[in-house]
């Protein structure tokens, strides 16, 4: 089991939660990004730097993740691909993607892309609230407990 992070877009506060969780759970945490990242010294935490470019980090995560892994991403198409491989996917707000919800999210993502392409300003997500951070940490712990039961 490995936790993969789509790190270019992951908020620092979520990375901090993940650093602590990797130590506590003694699980590999791999942050994939197209830029250099500073991470705390740990035998469980490492970075994987990829070339800059559209979906390069996403493609590397899909290539390397396995069934039973967890991928942290707000990227809906990436979440869909890792779910197909049997990995779990969790966004930085603590929403766990599932086979049941991912199709709806992909449809909404496509719709928003169409709106943006036609010139409509759609805005971005709200900033992470303390409640979002708590929800993320709780869902991370829930995934960990479920993974331990499956062993």
From Swiss-Prot:
InterPro entries: UPF0178. PANTHER family: UPF0178 PROTEIN YAII (PTHR35146:SF1). HAMAP family: UPF0178. Belongs to the UPF0178 family. This is UPF0178 protein YaiI. It comes from Salmonella paratyphi C (strain RKS4594). The lineage of its organism: Bacteria, Pseudomonadati, Pseudomonadota, Gammaproteobacteria, Enterobacterales. The gene is yaiI.
């Amino acid at each position: 089991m490995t936790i993969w992070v789509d790190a270019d877009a992951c908020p620092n506060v979520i990375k901090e939660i993940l650093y602590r969780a990797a130590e506590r759970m003694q699980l590999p945490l791999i942050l994939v990004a197209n830029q250099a990242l500073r991470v705390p010294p740990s035998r469980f935490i490492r970075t994987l730097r990829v070339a800059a470019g559209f979906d390069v980090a996403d493609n590397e995560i899909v290539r390397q993740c396995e069934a039973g892994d967890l991928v942290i991403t707000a990227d809906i198409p990436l979440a869909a691909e890792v779910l197909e491989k049997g990995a779990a996917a969790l966004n930085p707000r603590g929403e766990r993607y599932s086979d049941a919800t991912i199709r709806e999210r992909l449809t909404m993502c496509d719709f928003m892309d169409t709106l943006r392409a036609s010139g409509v300003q759609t805005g971005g997500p709200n900033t992470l609230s303390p409640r979002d951070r708590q929800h993320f940490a709780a869902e991370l712990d829930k995934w960990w407990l479920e993974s331990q039961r499956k062993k």
